[in-house]
Amino acid sequence: MMHHCSITKPTFSISISTQKLHHHSSKFLNLGFRIRCESGDVSSPLRTKAVSLSSEMEDSSSLKKSLMELEGKKSEPYPGGMPKMGPFTGRDPNVKKPAWLRQKAPQGERFQEVKESLSRLNLNTVCEEAQCPNIGECWNGGGDGVATATIMVLGDTCTRGCRFCAVKTSRNPPPPDPMEPENTAKAIASWGVDYIVITSVDRDDIPDGGSGHFAQTVKAMKRHKPDIMIECLTSDFRGDLEAVDTLVHSGLDVFAHNVETVKRLQRLVRDPRAGYEQSMSVLKHAKISKPGMITKTSIMLGLGETDEELKEAMADLRAIDVDILTLGQYLQPTPLHLTVKEYVTPEKFDFWKTYGESIGFRYVASGPLVRSSYRAGELFVKTMVKESYSKSLS
């Protein structure tokens, strides 16, 4: 069972008020500090203490003493929390990022070429918007030397506010660029890749959730490069199964939609408009709408899920015949996002890969830096697509 140690120390936010001697002077008469100590326990009252320091003081010993006094008054656990963001945000100092998650800053000639190509064609990528840790590897070409990126269509602004995601949000984002499908197709064709992942923000402000625009992008790519394999990582379209049909029959090769986390944590992790059953319905319908369609999903680990809960989610996914599962470590984009509860070891990820394939998934990509649009297993997926296509012709 996964375990999380709560923080045992309070944290403090300090606001400073100043009073000048007169408008010609740059010296301050005094500094007024208000120290806010917040407990992660919602039943515990906030404590505030004021401290005044004279302008002549040369050190912060009085302030340190006051902080120590406040700290001494707190004995209950502090599990994390940012003001106004709830008790599940903030950095947990007891959960340190391990060495296996440290990545070099992305750089290189090929990386810059991809970046400039995307900028020139006004295209968005989930690589940048979601702060993907694998951006350097993918844009530089990885092991096969072929650079690729995961294109994000329907703009760069999401109508939802999932608590794990770094993509910017708005209730009324700008309308989709009508030239985006064609520009995307041109960019991908120029890269020379034979497998591409397209994803999108959620667009609850559009009647079909953006499925029509998404489908146009797929069709444009197939026109420019008929032999390219396209994986679409989609939203849930608010559970609109007709929207799912539109995309499934657009010419894509892999239909992907992420359940993100186990059933118990859905409401904590995802926007209220998303949900476990709704995501399962979308994945199930993609298979029904087009028999033989390869389906894929992803789950983040390290959010506080238990082994039994993860096994239950994996069983539910196999019950609707999902083919591919990716498992990766949740990484907190900013202190305002959900706190990492645990850094799962590479050995445990190996265990989940073996377990997933033992219960019937055709492929499981499992590792700390694996993401739903990651290249891991790309060759295997290509083989699956070709096999599925051959069966449909026979």
Curated annotation (Swiss-Prot):
Task: Report a single Gene Ontology molecular function.
Answer: metal ion binding
Q: Which CDD domains match?
A: Radical_SAM
The record's subcellular locations are:
Plastid, Chloroplast
Q: Which residues bind [4Fe-4S] cluster 1?
A: C127, C132, C138, S373
Q: What is the UniProt remark on how the cofactor binds and its stoichiometry?
A: Binds 2 [4Fe-4S] clusters per subunit. One cluster is coordinated with 3 cysteines and an exchangeable S-adenosyl-L-methionine.
Pathway given for this chain reads: Protein modification; protein lipoylation via endogenous pathway; protein N(6)-(lipoyl)lysine from octanoyl-[acyl-carrier-protein]: step 2/2
Traits of the deletion mutant: Embryonic lethality.
Where does it sit, as one GO cellular component term? chloroplast
Instruction: Name the chemical reaction catalysed here.
Output: [[Fe-S] cluster scaffold protein carrying a second [4Fe-4S](2+) cluster] + N(6)-octanoyl-L-lysyl-[protein] + 2 oxidized [2Fe-2S]-[ferredoxin] + 2 S-adenosyl-L-methionine + 4 H(+) = [[Fe-S] cluster scaffold protein] + N(6)-[(R)-dihydrolipoyl]-L-lysyl-[protein] + 4 Fe(3+) + 2 hydrogen sulfide + 2 5'-deoxyadenosine + 2 L-methionine + 2 reduced [2Fe-2S]-[ferredoxin]
List the EC numbers from the record: 2.8.1.8
Domain named Radical SAM core: residues: 141-362
UniProt lists the family membership as follows: Belongs to the radical SAM superfamily. Lipoyl synthase family.
NCBIfam families listed in its UniProt record: lipA, PRK05481.1, PRK12928.1
Q: Protein name, please? A: Lipoyl synthase, chloroplastic
According to its UniProt entry, this protein's organism is: Arabidopsis thaliana (Mouse-ear cress)
